[in-house]
Amino acid sequence: MPNNCTKKNKKYYHCISIIDMNNIKGIVKFKSYNNKCTINYKIKNLSNGKHGFHVHKHGDLSQGCTSGCEHFNPDNHEHGGPHSKIRHAGDLGNIISSNKESFGSITVNNLSCNPKSKCSIVGRMIIIHEDPDDLGK
């Protein structure tokens, strides 16, 4: 769940999510500006291959990933890939792990670290799925 969300200056917001579950550890950093969000991630001990990567609606961990509910979707769009014209705001595509590590960066529209935005990720769950995402296909 993104925490430590701060306004770095008058131009952008920044959030950090620490991952530490079932021996999978890592960090996901979000930086948002003008309705675009850049996500940098570094994950360790993740099985090799593609894994769906999403922001889910709720940050409730009481029942593990199940309590996170569906993908974050404030505009009620269909599921898609991170660069699809029509997509859930929380659709971040797939990350690829090799040698049990995954790191990279992605920039998407319609996500924000601003807690006042309808597209805010603050308090939501970040999930790295065991299986690949179909990107809405």
Stretches found by the model and what they are:
Residues P2-K137:
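N-terminal leader/targeting pre-sequences
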